Amino acid sequence: MPEPLTPSAQKVQDALAAQGFSYQVVESPTPSRTAAEAARLVGCQVAQIAKSLVFRMKQSGRPVLVIASGANQVNEWRIGALLKEPLEKAPAAFVREHTGFAIGGVAPLGHPKPLDTFIDQDLLKLQEIWAAAGTPNALFRLVPGDLAKMTGGRVVKVT
């Protein structure tokens, strides 16, 4: 019988089920705090890791979630231009407050309130991707097209 999931990973599993997705969260004893570590852990390419990055809008203070390919660096200016407001990197406490997760484990869903979300168009070129699931030790595999369905996010160029 598999080990029970930690509370944060279970929260993501429950959010997946609530939205009708049958994806399974898996946890490892080894944490993966970077896209490269996560890719090694699950045996995929770095580009297949969907990293969830949280930014704060400079004037309004609203959170913004960018789900990017692990191979890409997010161009904050580009996303800010889409929002018509500059962005800044969000501090750890802000990330936890608005997502319910610590940096390194931010999942694309399961947040206390919906976030403005942007999805890297490069992820949709892949057959399967992996996303964080609540902790640095938890991930789930999914079809890239489901990201927009589960997050309500806009697919854009993020680089």
In which residue ranges do the predicted regions lie?
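Extended, low-hydrophobicity, polar/charged segments
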Residues: 1-159
